């Protein structure tokens, strides 16, 4: 029962997402994308959803992308940088959060830019935050503050 606008663009987007070698959940029209190389803990998931909401994004405007890594699939089926590039550009979010080292590496290759951890970055105009391990940061108050300091640099969704 997803309602999809019948524009050629949404059909192309749906096609790109459907062939993505990895997991894609959430909205195909997401404005806020979370990329990780393995499923997030419920604590990390909830913290990221709460962060997105505090920046003005609605839970239905989020997408979660989990890369398929070689450890759990045949190498041919693992997510390549170009796969991540295609899926992110198909969705075209305002904000991208890379939650772990492998996700940062793949995105860095995908966009051919060096990415700095815990500092505001731009990926072809998308606001981006990169974390070595978002889950580790959540274990301490200081870590949570560091994570939020980066997350709050992401584009705010101005409420109309």
List the model feature ranges, each with a label.
Residues 1-160:
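A polyanion-binding, active-site-adjacent surface
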